[in-house]
Curated annotation (Swiss-Prot):
Gene: Dcaf11
Record lineage: Eukaryota, Metazoa, Chordata, Craniata, Vertebrata
Protein name from the UniProt record: DDB1- and CUL4-associated factor 11
Comp. bias regions, Basic and acidic residues: 80-89
SMART domains, sorted: WD40
The protein's role, per its UniProt record: May function as a substrate receptor for CUL4-DDB1 E3 ubiquitin-protein ligase complex.
Entry-linked InterPro entries: DCAF (IPR051859), DCAF11/LEC14B (IPR017399), G-protein_beta_WD-40_rep (IPR020472), WD40/YVTN_repeat-like_dom_sf (IPR015943), WD40_repeat_dom_sf (IPR036322), WD40_rpt (IPR001680)
Repeat positions for WD: 170-210, 216-258, 263-302, 305-345, 353-392, 435-480, 481-520
GO biological process terms held by the UniProt record: cognition; exploration behavior; gene expression; memory; proteasome-mediated ubiquitin-dependent protein catabolic process; protein stabilization; protein ubiquitination; respiratory system process
Keywords, in A-Z order: Phosphoprotein, Repeat, Ubl conjugation pathway, WD repeat
Record-level GO cellular component terms: Cul4-RING E3 ubiquitin ligase complex; nucleoplasm
Subunit record text: Interacts with DDB1 and CUL4A.
Region (Disordered): 1-40, 80-100
């Protein structure tokens, strides 16, 4: 799975891309038209493949000796480049100083977030939102039942966002994936060294307790997921199989789920598991969605979903009936699992507005809202009650096909810095200020329990973790320490902790630390230490809120 094909450009023996039937949907013609316009079609095919990064022209020993090098995918290529993910350090993503919030003002998500963070009905003054004022109200017995509501607890926690590096684990190769389990007790990390590492996160710890060698890995593990019961995890790679492995027990029990693809070079870029653990959803480089039934132990669906790589899949909520997919055609599609058929692959709707391929999708978990990260250097917030028109879909497709740069090894063109809204863009909000280069960088909603999902956070090609306020669109926090792009980020479901996974070969845990002391809060030994060595950050006293069982 790790090879690339090369052929002489002058020999006329160029092999067509094996995924071209799906990638070049706009180039399909009848056999009669192909015979009449063969030369034109070949030129269009070559231009398309060069533009999308599927092939590259490489000069050999002489000026006339040109070779076509076939790359595996526009999204995750199966070899390491010289820049090693550090090109993005030279790119300073433009920050949107005045985000357009007009669509959000009249959408229900604004009310939902304000309710979840205890801000509904409050004014806009800083005093009304201040932490001291909330404590004063509680002391006076003005809070509901004498204590903070769940929304007020989330508002309190918003004052203690992670800001300090508390733990680092270093690997010999790039870290690709890193996620917390649903209960926050385990963190799973996947690295290019084909090793999956599991960390015990109970009782405030972050201790590695198991390392598992992944099987049938081409280039790297590309995505991971936990099963709902928390006893197994799944991973995908450049392989025909999605693997499932046990977490507990002495041995490692691996089971291969055969997707039986039509492509010879095949990769699953994104995976998701249904809430009952029965079905596994995958998005692949052949433009298809795959559904594998674990009870029947077979692939049950192969849906032609996108015109290019499917980079992202997600279930909309716990029912697992509605699902989302996003691809390099810049379109996010919404599917109903109950009506999905191979002979009639029609989504229930589409969301258009991105100008380049989608790298990741995260659902808010309410079967209505989702966010998508894109190579156009933006995150967009969507409401599935606002599907895009045909005009919007055509505008996004056209913008994506007109991109003439490759995000894997080229700098972002200046035209992509412009704040431009495509005709028919149905998104509620656009977030700018992070970089999406080199790889499929992830973005996610912050947890509901501790933050009321009032934030969106993303990895960044400049080695940062960027946290946005969902309603204002402004950046509220940047975590900076990595030396290469941050591909994955994961926020603990109940605690103010964020873990970043980077191509610099490190995993980093971020927590809140108080930067200033108040004399009344310090012991005599603390005062002596500060006077002798200067101020140093100390752990913030934990704000103890109960978590659901």
């Amino acid at each position: 799975m790790g090879s690339r094909n090369s052929s002489s450009a002058g020999s006329g023996s160029l092999e067509p891309s094996e995924g071209l039937s799906r990638r070049g949907a706009g180039l399909r013609r009848s056999e009669e038209e192909e015979e009449e316009d063969e030369d034109v079609d070949l030129a269009q095919v070559l231009a398309y493949l060069l533009r999308r990064g599927q092939v590259r022209l490489v000069q050999g020993g002489g000026a006339a000796n040109l070779q076509l090098i076939q790359a595996l995918s526009d999204s995750e290529e199966e070899h390491d480049s010289a820049w090693d993910g550090r090109l993005g350090d030279r790119y300073n993503p433009p920050v949107d100083a005045t985000p357009d919030t007009r669509e959000l003002e009249y959408n229900e998500i604004k009310t939902r977030v304000e309710l979840a963070t205890g801000r509904l009905g409050l004014g806009r003054t800083a005093q009304e939102h201040s932490f001291p004022r909330m404590l004063h109200q509680r002391e006076r017995g003005l809070c509901h039942r004498g204590s903070f509501s769940l929304g007020e607890q989330s508002r309190v926690m918003s004052h203690f966002l992670p800001n300090d590096l508390s733990f680092t684990d270093t690997y010999s190769q790039k870290a690709f994936c890193g996620i917390y389990s649903k209960d926050g007790q385990i963190f799973m990390s996947a690295c290019q060294d084909q090793t999956i590492r599991l960390y015990d996160c109970r009782y405030g710890r972050f201790h590695k307790f198991k390392s598992i060698k992944a099987r049938d890995v081409g280039w790297s593990v590309l995505d991971v997921a936990f099963t709902p019961d928390g006893n197994h995890f799944l991973y995908s790679s450049w392989s025909d199989y999605i693997h499932i492995c046990s977490i507990y027990g002495e041995g490692d029990t691996h089971t291969a789920l055969d997707l039986r693809p039509d492509e010879r070079r095949f990769a699953v870029f994104s995976i998701a598991v249904s809430s009952d653990g029965r079905e596994v959803l995958g998005g692949a480089n052949d433009g298809c969605l795959y559904v594998f039934d674990r009870e029947q132990n077979r692939r049950t669906l192969q849906i032609e979903s996108h015109e290019d790589d499917v980079n992202a899949v997600a279930f909309a909520d716990i029912s697992s009936q509605i699902l989302f997919s996003g691809g390099d055609d810049a379109i996010c599609k919404v599917w109903d699992r109950r009506t999905m058929r191979e002979d009639d692959p029609k989504p229930v709707g589409a969301l258009a507005g991105h100008q380049d391929g989608i790298t990741f999708i995260d659902s808010k978990g309410d079967a209505r809202y989702l966010i998508s990260n894109s190579k156009d250097q933006t995150i967009k917030l969507w409401d599935i009650r606002r599907f895009s028109s045909r005009e919007g879909m055509e505008a996004s497709r056209l913008a994506a096909t007109q991109q003439n740069w490759d995000y894997r090894w080229q700098q972002v063109p200046k035209k992509a810095w412009k704040k431009l809204k495509l005709p028919g863009d149905s998104s509620l909000m656009t977030y700018r200020g992070h970089g999406v280069l080199h790889t499929l960088i992830r973005c996610r909603f912050s947890p509901a329990h501790s933050t009321g999902q009032q934030f969106i956070y993303s990895g960044c090609s400049t080695g940062k973790v960027v946290v946005y306020d969902l309603l204002s669109g402004h950046i509220v926090k940047k975590l900076t320490n990595h030396k290469a792009c941050v591909r994955d980020v994961s926020w603990h479901p109940f605690e103010e902790k964020i873990v970043s996974s980077s191509w610099d070969g490190s995993l980093r845990l971020w927590q809140y630390r108080q930067a200033e002391y108040f004399q009344d809060d310090m012991t005599e030994s603390d005062r002596n230490r500060v006077c002798s060595s200067g101020p140093a950050p100390v752990p913030c006293p934990s704000v103890a809120f109960s978590s659901p069982q």
